Amino acid sequence: AELEAAGKVKAVVTQNIDGLHQLAGSKRVLELHGSVHRNYCRNCGKGFDAEYVRDYPGKVPLCDACGGTIKPDVVLYEEGLDQQTLEDPVFYISHADLLIIGGTSLAVYPAAGLIDYYRGNKLVLINKSTTPMDARADLLIQAGLGDVFGQIEV
């Protein structure tokens, strides 16, 4: 968030669904797999916040408008991403001067394929274990993402 506020980071692209980037203060967070903080009725599409779902008295939260089942706005296994979800990440990645990828094995597609849109020559990979893209990195840091970002001074 501090790097974004300083104009050093244009966007955060994440597969995480927990909303922690926003909690840390990041403003432009592109959530590939959605967020558990947004929920919607599978029948009528009405939106609900996490508190409604958490405080719902029954086991399965139901829509107060139509009685339909409420689902978190997240991509579940075997569900694909729609093209619109990928448009902004592709834009920011393809226009980046520096691309930092961290905390991912680069094994989950289509998210892992977004690296192919990067046209720059400053690719930084930060991950505890090896990834299929390690050889492409200009800087490879084999460490925990939290440890690395904890040492950055803005």
Feature locations, PLM:
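Conserved catalytic alpha/beta core of Sir2/sirtuin-type deacylases, generalized to analogous enzyme cores
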Residues: A1-V154
